[in-house]
């Protein structure tokens, strides 16, 4: 974040005026200092970012790589892409910093000194580039060429061990100072196994990357490294999609990098194997990197999942069958009233419709002879439910009673955890037909109520406004769903989907208000990382919101888990745990892997398993066992990361706009457990393109 400073001193050009620059250091500490910026210069990669020299406190030279603003060509859409590139680049730089330590001037990668991802133009700060780009370095001595070759492959081997792939290696991103290389273009680094997106130009970008075919492979970068070496040896670019025709004339290059010119990644060696050939005395990258800090916690997930299997637990993404109740469309025609939990069936003699002032008046469907008009009127009609001794009479939308067994979902978490924002974006994504790839179509249960939800929640949030806190209910009020939809699956079965979203303080009550939980079909437990995780980079957010870390877990979780009935050692209601506000952790592994995925990435059972394993490990390490109680209690439970907004709020607005990330994955997991969608098995990351 920047604040205008006192302005330039006498004789300084206007562009060099001082501003106060605020950023986080790689260890999560807030730093504020005066800065002067030079003009935008040539990019250090081919990505959608801007670069300029920067002077901090009149002494520290650095380079600022920043996102383009909304005034850049392409407008808001290009700005979002640019912000996403900075997010991804910073996550990579932080991962390298933590894996390699704070490298000195001889390190193979750019040295990160700070970053700010929630500024209007998010940025990262690096030490100045070392050496010169190799674009015009034809004629280097053979000894130097061998060092460049070894260091390029070594850098790719390090990235591969970290689960990363560099898609931006080209002469302008490789620098050489006579002794060591420095590899820039971190915005072009992606995760192994992620779908390739078209990027780069021939001959340096591999054919599969230029075409956006298949999935990212650590061997992608070897093609680019080989092309860079060919240009250094010959002074000209190589062939775009095959080995250079004169490769045999350059015997040393053909011996070391010949196999790296294979057009398909699957036909190239791995970086580790090639490094062993080029530098047999150098320790493998795996031996030089610190142990994975989450490995032991992932193993804990495996043990916890295995302990549930004797009780009937299924793998993530599989249907759990009768454990979740009767199938949709039970032949009795009865459904459970979501409010009083009494059986109810459609009764044409108990219908009401709203008048001009929204007062419910008796409605006789037999008075409407036109079948089309009757169907439309019934969509807006309500049926009186007499209630019981605890819950007074109330009204249920007619389509809720006439479309099979409803699926009711409750959002669980204390106040300010982001439940309402997450639910709002779930509904918005459904309304945008984001479930269509899974064969699911939708329609509102009650058009007027749905329009009210869109106007009161979706429109303000997508306009960048922070939603008001959910109001608490009075002692005599009944919990009601806030939105309901009709969903039709790929087989043509339709059923209502209804969401409950209560205030956090109401979820702590032990009176009749929470009786709706006795008939609930699915639970979404929302974890707020600012309350759950004592990470340094979250301290500033906690201070702003006057929040504190609670190592004892969310009290709303405990109340709900105690209230929902169970018939054995485990709760059988399908559940999902969601680390919400995950944008606050978007540069943290493993959150960066999942949150940075393209929105079109298909879900599979294997991916659900991998994400659940990662999120369990994250919570186990950084939050503690109390925050994993929903997973330990529920027989069928997956874990997820999601962000409803994509960034932090400021003065009741989201200054960068709003971008939903992974908000539907928890719901899709619940759909899979209920047999509404059938997810493919998928394949492991280490099998990509084999």
Segments predicted by a language model, with ranges:
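Catalytic-loop of the protein kinase fold
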Residues: 156-177
């Amino acid at each position: 974040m920047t604040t205008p400073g006192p302005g330039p001193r006498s004789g300084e050009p206007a562009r060099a005026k001082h501003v106060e620059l605020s950023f986080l250091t790689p260890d999560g500490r807030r730093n504020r200092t005066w800065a002067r910026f030079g003009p935008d210069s040539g990019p250090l990669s081919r990505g959608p970012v801007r670069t300029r020299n920067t002077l901090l406190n009149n002494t520290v030279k650095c380079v600022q790589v920043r996102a383009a603003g909304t005034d850049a060509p392409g407008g808001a859409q290009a700005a979002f892409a640019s912000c996403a590139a900075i997010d991804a680049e910073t996550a990579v730089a932080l991962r390298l910093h933590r894996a390699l330590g704070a490298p000195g001037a001889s390190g193979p990668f750019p040295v990160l000194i700070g970053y700010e991802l929630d500024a209007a133009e998010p940025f990262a700060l690096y030490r100045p580039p070392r050496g010169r780009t190799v674009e015009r370095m034809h004629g280097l001595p053979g000894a130097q060429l061998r060092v460049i070759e070894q260091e390029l492959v070594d850098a790719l081997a390090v990235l591969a061990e970290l689960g990363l792939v560099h898609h931006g290696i080209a002469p302008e991103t490789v620098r050489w100072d006579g002794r060591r290389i420095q590899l820039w273009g971190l915005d072009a680094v992606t995760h192994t196994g992620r779908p390739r997106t078209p990027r780069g130009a021939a001959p340096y970008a591999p054919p599969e990357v230029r075409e956006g075919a298949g999935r990212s492979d650590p061997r992608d970068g070897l093609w680019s490294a080989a092309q860079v070496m060919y240009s250094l040896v010959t002074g000209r670019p190589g062939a775009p999609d095959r080995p250079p025709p004169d490769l045999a004339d350059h015997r040393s290059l053909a011996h070391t990098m010949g196999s790296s010119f294979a057009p398909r990644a699957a036909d190239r060696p791995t970086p580790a194997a090639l490094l062993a050939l080029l530098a047999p005395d150098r320790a493998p990258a795996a031996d030089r990197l610190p142990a994975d800090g989450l490995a032991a916690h992932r193993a804990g997930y495996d043990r916890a999942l295995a302990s549930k299997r004797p009780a009937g637990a299924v793998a993530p993404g599989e249907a759990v069958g009768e454990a979740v109740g009767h199938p949709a469309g039970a032949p009795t025609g009865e459904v459970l009233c979501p409010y009083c939990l009494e059986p109810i069936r459609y009764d044409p003699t108990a219908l009401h419709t709203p008048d001009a002032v929204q007062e419910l008046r008796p409605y006789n469907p037999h008075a409407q002879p036109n079948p089309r008009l009757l169907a439309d009127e019934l969509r807006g009609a309500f049926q009186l439910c007499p209630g019981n001794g605890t819950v007074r009479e109330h009204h249920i939308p007619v389509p809720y009673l006439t479309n099979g067994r409803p699926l009711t979902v409750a959002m669980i978490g204390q106040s300010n955890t982001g439940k309402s924002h997450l639910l709002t974006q779930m509904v918005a994504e459904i309304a945008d037909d984001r479930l269509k790839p899974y064969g699911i179509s939708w329609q509102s249960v009650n058009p007027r109520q749905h329009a009210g939800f869109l106007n009161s929640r979706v429109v303000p949030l997508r306009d960048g406004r922070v939603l008001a806190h959910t109001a608490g209910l009075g002692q005599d009020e009944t919990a009601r769903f806030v939105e309901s939809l009709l969903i039709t699956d790929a087989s043509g079965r339709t059923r209502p989907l209804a969401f409950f979203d209560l205030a956090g303080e109401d979820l702590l009550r032990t009176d009749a208000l929470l009786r709706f939980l006795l008939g609930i079909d699915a639970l979404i437990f929302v974890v707020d990382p600012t309350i759950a995780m004592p990470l340094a980079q979250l301290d500033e957010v906690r201070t702003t919101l006057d929040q504190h870390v609670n190592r004892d877990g969310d009290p709303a979780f405990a109340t709900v888990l105690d209230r929902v009935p169970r018939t054995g050692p485990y709760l059988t209601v399908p559940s999902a745990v969601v680390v919400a506000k995950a944008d606050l952790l978007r540069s943290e592994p493993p959150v960066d892997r999942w949150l940075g995925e393209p929105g079109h990435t298909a879900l599979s059972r294997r991916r659900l398993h991998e994400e659940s394993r990662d999120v369990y490990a994250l919570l186990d390490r950084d939050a503690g066992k109390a925050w994993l109680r929903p997973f330990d209690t529920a027989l069928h439970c997956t874990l997820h990361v999601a962000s409803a907004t994509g960034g932090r709020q400021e003065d009741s607005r989201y200054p960068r706009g709003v971008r939903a990330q992974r908000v539907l994955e928890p719901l899709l997991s619940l759909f899979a457990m209920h047999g509404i969608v059938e997810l493919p098995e998928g394949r492991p990351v280490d099998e990509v393109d084999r």
